[in-house]
């Protein structure tokens, strides 16, 4: 097996039966099943959802994105070996722990393969639910320049880089481009305050104003569950991003759930505890890859300056990264996944062929 073959780089060309366009994100692709296949799987598999619930196959890839671009490595390596399986394994573990702790459900109904989730259709909240326990990254850069108010919250004077904050901070941003909301610019990923959400809760996708309290409660509780579990592994949960949505349960009631992925190296910063106590930062998340890129390219402003996006896209397209850098990221992702789950992340010889075989033979979703 070649290293490039073990990587699932293209995940939007699987022959899964669907009558809708495949939705391709930076890392995952979503295949909406036909009404007939959704109803059949709900019946055959006994999923605890209404009989007419639309289902989708969500396939993760091994692609790596940073600064809104997809990067690749030498030897035609179009992703990070083990990354997709590691991300799904970590999310599956945390979602299970949330359930054990009486928190909300997720959108996942079934896990046919390490790269694949069967999910129910959700109505997403249009908020990137970001929560921070330490001041670092973009927040520290802004604080250093004199900013003190973040998403309507005023931070005290005298904070130091990478310091633990006095309390958990919720610093939401917009998910997608939202139009017609007073005071909220019509662009992706804009910081917003709780007051913005309260004044326009329906525009942000909340069904009831009281659900803003519930989303914040689930955000803090989910963060707490992961933070406590990581602390036992001597890992520091620094900050993370959650996503939420509504689904209809088997009784026809609407309920708020966790969506997408949670507590992964892609959506979070995780630091090594021993190094942090020693005054050093050792990243066990994608932040390490971002820092590598900022040091690797001679003009890091291209990666940070939103006005230089065409140059950034060319940089990612035209530069194959060193193999050892790609494998360092692989070790970070598989290492933290194995710590969290207590199980080895196995590299597949040919993940695409495995996925097709399972979905054909066990789920009858491939003609």
UniProtKB/Swiss-Prot annotation:
EC category name: ligase
Keyword Ligase: yes
Keyword annotations from UniProtKB, A to Z: ATP-binding, Ligase, Nucleotide-binding, Purine biosynthesis
One record GO biological process: 'de novo' IMP biosynthetic process
GO molecular function: ATP binding; phosphoribosylaminoimidazolesuccinocarboxamide synthase activity
Keyword Manganese: no
One GO cellular component term noted in the UniProt record for this chain: cytoplasm
Reaction(s) this enzyme catalyzes, per UniProt: 5-amino-1-(5-phospho-D-ribosyl)imidazole-4-carboxylate + L-aspartate + ATP = (2S)-2-[5-amino-1-(5-phospho-beta-D-ribosyl)imidazole-4-carboxamido]succinate + ADP + phosphate + 2 H(+)
Entries under PROSITE patterns matching the protein: SAICAR_SYNTHETASE_1
Pathway(s) this gene product operates in, as recorded in its UniProt entry: Purine metabolism; IMP biosynthesis via de novo pathway; 5-amino-1-(5-phospho-D-ribosyl)imidazole-4-carboxamide from 5-amino-1-(5-phospho-D-ribosyl)imidazole-4-carboxylate: step 1/2
Matches recorded under Pfam families: SAICAR_synt
EC number: 6.3.2.6
Family: Belongs to the SAICAR synthetase family.
Protein name: Phosphoribosylaminoimidazole-succinocarboxamide synthase
Name of the encoding gene: purC
């Amino acid at each position: 097996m070649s290293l490039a073959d073990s990587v699932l780089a293209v995940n939007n060309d699987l022959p899964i039966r669907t009558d809708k366009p495949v939705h391709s994100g930076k890392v995952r692709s979503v295949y909406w099943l036909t009404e007939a296949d959704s109803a059949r799987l709900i019946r055959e598999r006994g999923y605890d959802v209404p009989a007419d619930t639309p289902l989708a196959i969500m396939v993760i890839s091994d692609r790596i994105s940073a600064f809104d671009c997809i990067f690749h490595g030498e030897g035609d390596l179009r992703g990070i070996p083990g990354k997709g399986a590691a991300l799904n394994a970590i999310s599956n573990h945390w979602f299970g722990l949330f359930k054990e702790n009486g928190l909300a459900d997720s959108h996942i109904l079934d896990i046919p393969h390490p790269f694949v989730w069967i999910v129910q259709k959700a109505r997403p909240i249009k908020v990137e639910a970001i929560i921070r326990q330490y001041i670092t990254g973009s927040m520290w850069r802004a604080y250093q320049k004199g900013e003190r108010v973040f998403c309507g919250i005023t931070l005290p004077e005298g904070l130091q880089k990478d310091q633990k904050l006095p309390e958990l901070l919720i610093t939401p941003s917009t998910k997608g481009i939202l139009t017609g909301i007073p005071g909220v610019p019509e662009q992706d990923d804009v910081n917003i305050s709780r007051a913005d959400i309260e004044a326009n809760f329906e525009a942000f996708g909340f069904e009831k104003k009281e659900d803003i309290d519930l989303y914040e409660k689930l955000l803090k509780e989910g963060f707490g569950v992961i933070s406590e579990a990581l602390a036992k592994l001597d890992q520091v949960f620094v900050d993370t991003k959650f996503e939420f949505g509504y689904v209809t349960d088997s009784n026809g009631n609407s309920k708020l759930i966790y969506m997408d992925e949670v507590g992964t190296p892609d959506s979070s910063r995780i630091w090594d505890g021993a190094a942090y106590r020693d005054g050093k930062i050792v990243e066990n998340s994608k932040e390490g890859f971002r820092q590598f890129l900022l040091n690797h390219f001679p003009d890091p402003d291209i990666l940070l300056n939103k006005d230089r996006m065409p140059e950034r896209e060319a940089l990612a397209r035209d530069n194959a990264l060193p193999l050892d850098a790609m494998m360092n990221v692989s070790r970070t992702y598989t290492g933290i996944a194995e710590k969290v789950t207590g199980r080895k992340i196995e590299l597949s010889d040919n993940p695409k062929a495995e996925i097709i075989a399972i979905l054909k033979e066990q789920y009858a979703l491939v003609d």
